[in-house]
Amino acid sequence: MTNPQGRFRGLFIPHVTPFGDDGVLDLESLERLTTHQTSIHGVAGLVSCARIGEGPVLGLEEKQRVYEVAGKVARKAGKLHIATIAPQSTDEAIRLIRDLENLPVDAVMIFPPLLLAWGKVESELKFRFFEDITRATSMPLVLFQIPVKSYWYDPATICRIAGLNNVVAFKEASFDIDLFTETMKQLERAKASMEVLSGNDRFVAESYRLGAAGALIGVANVATEKWAAMDLAAQQGDFDRAAALQKELEAVKEIVFREPIVEAVARIKIVLQHEGLIKTATVRRPQLGVSAEERKLLLDSYHALKKTGFRSSDSVAMAS
């Protein structure tokens, strides 16, 4: 890919992976869902097999099929497609990325290996992990700061990784505003060309004001048009408008990412099934899904929010 830097801007949706009642991949629903999402003005691209896409419980062959379907849909719509991998070694990362080179994939987002959370890990190990990958493949890469402190990359290490040729973007989802701010400052001083995509849905609008090029947030599977409008406002420099839209969307986030957060995928799928975009809301174990009572509360709250144009209000917030 020529000059990939600069393309990874805007709203990226880590889509869910639909299953049938029997737990088998539902590729028909996947195509319908991703076709809808990529048709929305302001959506820059799709992200496959991330946490929202239940990547950790998908087999390699299943992931390949998801990458193919979502990638073809994205290409047809003129949008970008990012595949997610979770390698545990450098060799595995290189092998997985090479397997993607002939698929409709524009970049690969890499979950940090478990080793990075094993006690105090030297920054050189984290840097060399990416350096070795970039020497073995030309595939554009997306660095991922997950919301688990023991895995974090410090700002100086991020700047070093950003200097590698094919590291094109960074999903910053630490949910730590101080770390995010310091990282943005150091990247600016380093004149890094790597784009920053905010995964911090608590302060995504503020992320734009601090220099983020876009957002990569699972909650955007619900009320996608409004999240896209927030992104477009920020892209146009209207940060006050973006902040106002985020405030209106707070109730959407609350009905999806309430505790237990691990069931957020199930809640998103319930809404998408209700909207006719996927056939079932089936999730894979060890996720348990939600009770019939919570399902009713969720859809009641969703209906109320939808009637208001997804504006946050005490009268439509889900009962605790």
Please tell me what each predicted stretch does:
Residues 2-150, 288, 312:
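Active-site beta->alpha loop and helix N-cap motifs at the rims of alpha/beta catalytic domains
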Residues 7, 12-18, 36-43, 51, ...:
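C-terminal alpha-helical cap/extension of soluble enzyme domains
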Residues 21, 27, 60, 155, ...:
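Alpha-helix N-capping/helix-start residues
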Residues 30, 67, 93, 130, ...:
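A general structural signal for well-ordered alpha-helical segments in protein cores
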Residues 31, 64, 68, 94, ...:
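Generic alpha-helical structural signal
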Residues 41-42, 78, 104, 165, ...:
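Glycine-centered loop/turn motif at secondary-structure junctions
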Residues 132-135, 147-253, 257-260:
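Catalytic alpha/beta core domains of metabolic enzymes, predominantly
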